[in-house]
């Protein structure tokens, strides 16, 4: 197995589920023995914390970036009481790495030291069809290229520094010029679309399972864009259900908070 692939597998939902069921993981053990070669008599979460420290110092992969964003932005600047996070959400032909929703929706596109920038323009354009704030999170390696493309635009730029802090290079600005009703409709789940329509007291013609998508969209697209976008953000915020596990989640190790948040399994470490 490729050594990098080994450590990438450690920080995954599949491994988290294994730990929840068995309280151990052969993948974690193998990676720990390879990278850390430390004491054997520690539990699986302690091994994951040691492996995360390796990521911090030697291999800042996408998981490290995502977990840093969750800890420093969702938990550091905001609150799980008022803010909802989404991850790996398809928008057009792109996948949004991380989205924060409070009074507004902000898409965070991650470009690690390991990534290329080839698709970045297309990704940003896709995101602006659904959300009006977009931020690129990158590093010193890519900063000059990112700045050359997006300086003095509406795109925000954050840098994950060598000290593993987030430094704001350019503040994001609201951009409504590319918002697209069809893209927003497709981003929402079926019941969310229906609630948005109901909130606006729109008359809905009779439909069946075969005509539902088109009939509801014909109604949906008549809602004024500003109202529509605000309603969409409100609906998306409801997807967060970590509040019932708040105390347990906040007490969990910082190294695995991203996995726990999106797995909705905050008692894995117990």
Model regions and ranges:
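Interdomain/boundary linker segments immediately adjacent to catalytic/signaling cores
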Residues: 1-60
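Nuclease catalytic cores
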Residues: 21, 58, 62, 221-225, ...
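Catalytic cores of nucleic-acid endonucleases
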Residues: 114-161
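C-terminal, charge/polar-rich interaction regions
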Residues: 222-270
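A conserved mid-domain beta-alpha-beta active-site/ligand-binding segment of alpha/beta enzyme cores
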Residues: 165-237
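Active-site metal-binding core of divalent-cation-utilizing nuclease and nuclease-like domains
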Residues: 57, 63-103, 150
């Amino acid at each position: 197995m490729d050594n990098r692939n080994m450590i990438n597998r450690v920080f995954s939902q599949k491994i988290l589920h294994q730990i929840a069921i068995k309280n151990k993981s052969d993948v974690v053990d193998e990676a720990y023995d390879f990278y850390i070669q430390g004491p054997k008599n520690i539990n699986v979460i302690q091994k994951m914390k040691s492996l995360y420290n390796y990521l911090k110092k030697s291999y800042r992969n996408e998981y490290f970036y995502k977990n840093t964003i969750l800890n420093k932005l969702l938990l550091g600047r905001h609150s799980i009481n008022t803010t909802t996070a989404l991850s790996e959400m398809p928008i057009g032909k792109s996948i949004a790495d991380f989205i924060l929703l409070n009074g507004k929706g902000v898409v965070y596109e991650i470009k690690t030291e390991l990534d290329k920038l080839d698709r970045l323009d297309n990704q940003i354009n896709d995101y602006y069809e659904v959300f009006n704030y977009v931020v690129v999170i990158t590093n010193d390696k890519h900063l000059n290229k990112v700045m050359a493309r997006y300086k003095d635009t509406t795109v925000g730029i954050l840098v994950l520094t060598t000290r593993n802090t987030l430094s704001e290079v350019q503040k994001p600005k609201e951009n409504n010029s590319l918002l697209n009703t069809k893209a927003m409709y497709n981003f929402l789940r079926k019941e969310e679309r229906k609630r948005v329509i109901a909130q606006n007291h729109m008359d809905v013609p009779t439909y069946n399972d075969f005509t539902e998508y088109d009939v509801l969209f014909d109604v949906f697209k008549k809602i004024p864009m500003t109202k529509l976008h605000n309603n969409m953000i409100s609906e998306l915020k409801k997807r967060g259900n970590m509040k019932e596990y708040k105390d347990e989640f906040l007490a969990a190790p910082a190294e695995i908070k991203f996995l726990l948040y999106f797995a909705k399994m905050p008692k894995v470490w117990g």
